[in-house]
Curated annotation (Swiss-Prot):
One of its GO terms (molecular function) is tRNA(Ile)-lysidine synthase activity. This is tRNA(Ile)-lysidine synthase. The gene is tilS. It comes from Wolbachia pipientis wMel. Keywords: ATP-binding, Cytoplasm, Ligase, Nucleotide-binding, tRNA processing. It is an enzyme of class 6 (ligase).
Length: 431
């Protein structure tokens, strides 16, 4: 069949040859077809069979039953193994579908990372792309939001592939019926309270759904090209305007910032905030643009917060500093055999053989800032966003910009830090 041949051409050119692959399976027709295609491809090429992962969001009474169906049917289709990942919901407010989507990807990526599976396949297709475009158009999205989905993306160290992107829902359903596959019809797909259902029905009601869907996807592709061009010039602006400091903050030179086209300057501010906060989701546009417009008023005072960051004017620069109250302390046991990540901004190597439990936490305003830190010519708020090694509220070691721990006289503990903010930036602006 043509779909199967085209699918094989897609995956034959992919990087996951000879590597374990996981497939996200909701139980819907698209993900069942993806699992069937991938299993057949692996068998044909004598490769490791895919692992099926399904997320139980627990949002409907039948959720557990559907998850059990996926596990059972995945085995029947020939999956190597199958697992149910449960979403532990807490205080859900606002857009529940968006929160469920974020939770789903988080659970899938974490499972893959914890089980040394580098490649995750998801079943987005051409109709998904068109519906997403219309949804975002209604919300007033910009170039990035209206851009086509990527065949390959990256999340928390995991490569995510979408091998069905060029296939329509009708082609996928035709394949499923031909092979007599079983799947679940999600009732929410027909629930008119969801905007996606509205746009799905709108496309179906058009004179020629396939042509309209194709043209919407083509427009999304044009937007993707435009987004890549904008990102290219954003990267150049970072080289000229931004200093990523070893002390874990970002400094934007205002003299250069004011010379940039507004779209590039806005992106530079956005990705600086995301890199410090280590978030893959963008902050609310209305909040971002309010801060941006304030920065553009050259005589205005800028001192505000967004996404767990402090954005403030300091001399001739704009500083993006981590908000200390949003930093979570972590507990580690000494000695540590390898570096540990702290606040997604630092890789910390803690040296010491006391065999005790310590915490890595920022300084509190009530704790003394050592003189050697004051010698650095930076905003004092930076000091309270740095990692220190503490026990019983006593500081055992301070970090040093030169990556050598400054120790107190009575404890033999070293805190060697390496900033990971540049890596955060690279992952954000390297499309």
């Amino acid at each position: 069949m043509e779909l199967e041949l085209l699918f094989q051409n897609v995956v034959n050119s992919s990087a996951f040859y000879n590597n374990q692959v996981a497939v996200a399976v909701s139980g819907g027709v698209d993900s069942i077809v993806l699992l069937h295609l991938m299993t057949n491809w692996a068998k044909k090429n004598k490769l490791s069979l895919p692992i099926a992962l399904t997320v139980n969001h627990g949002l409907r009474p039948e959720s557990q039953k559907e998850a059990d169906f996926v596990v059972s049917y995945a085995k029947e289709l020939g999956a190597k193994e199958s697992f149910i990942l449960n979403w532990e919901k807490q205080n859900i407010k606002g857009n529940i579908q968006l929160q469920a989507r974020k939770a789903r990807y988080k659970l899938l990526a974490e499972w893959c990372k914890n089980n040394n599976v580098k490649y995750l396949l998801v079943a987005h297709h051409k109709d998904d792309q068109a519906e997403t475009f219309l949804l975002r158009l209604e919300r007033g999205s910009g170039v990035d939001g209206l851009s086509s989905m990527d065949y390959k993306s990256f999340l928390n160290g995991i490569d995510i592939f979408r091998p069905l992107l060029n296939f329509s829902r009708s082609e996928i359903e035709k394949y499923a019926k031909l092979h007599r596959l079983k799947w679940i019809e999600d009732r929410s797909n027909h629930d008119l309270k969801y905007r996606r259902t509205l746009y799905r029905n709108l496309l179906k009601a058009s004179d020629n759904q396939e042509i309209l869907t194709e043209r919407i996807c083509l427009t999304a592709l044009h937007m993707k090209r435009a987004a890549k061009a904008l990102m290219h010039y954003t990267r150049l602006a970072f080289n000229d305007c931004v200093n990523v400091h070893d002390l874990g903050y970002i400094e934007i030179k205002l003299s250069e910032f004011y010379q940039l086209p507004e779209e590039i300057a806005l992106r530079l501010l956005l990705y600086s905030i995301m890199a410090i906060a280590s978030k893959h989701y963008k902050p609310r546009y209305s909040s971002l643009i309010a801060i941006f417009n304030r920065i553009l008023q050259k005589d205005s005072n800028v001192n505000c917060t967004l996404s767990g960051c402090k954005i403030r004017k300091y001399g001739e620069n704009i500083l993006i500093i981590r908000e200390s109250s949003r930093i979570q302390e972590i507990t580690v046991n000494l000695p540590l055999n390898e570096p540990t990540q702290w606040d997604n901004r630092f890789s910390c190597t803690i040296l010491g053989n006391q065999g005790c439990s310590v915490i890595i936490a920022p300084l509190k305003k009530t704790q003394k800032v050592p003189e050697f830190l004051k010698d650095y010519n930076c905003c004092p708020e930076v000091f309270y966003s740095l990692p220190t090694v503490q026990k019983d509220s006593k500081v055992l070691a301070y970090p040093d910009v030169n990556y050598n721990g400054k120790n107190t006289n009575d404890d033999k503990v070293q805190c060697i830090i390496n900033s990971t903010i540049k890596q955060n930036l690279v992952s954000l602006i390297s499309i």
